[in-house]
């Protein structure tokens, strides 16, 4: 599992883009037990969790809004490819 680092400032929006173009099955936080932010399904429905302010989500991107130091976390995306799951992580730092 790869990990990338993203930096942002308080009050800013942050766009995380999964550029590997695989079918994403969900976006999660990976700190404190890994809560689901958005569950992306093939019919386009999403499930919102209040852990972070999410303004939009798709199979390839997640936009977090109004970042604070409380949203400084590990964020991840899960992929499904030929019935196997994989993923990527982003360490988000808010200053």
UniProtKB/Swiss-Prot annotation:
Superkingdom of the organism of origin: Viruses
Name of protein: Protein RL5A
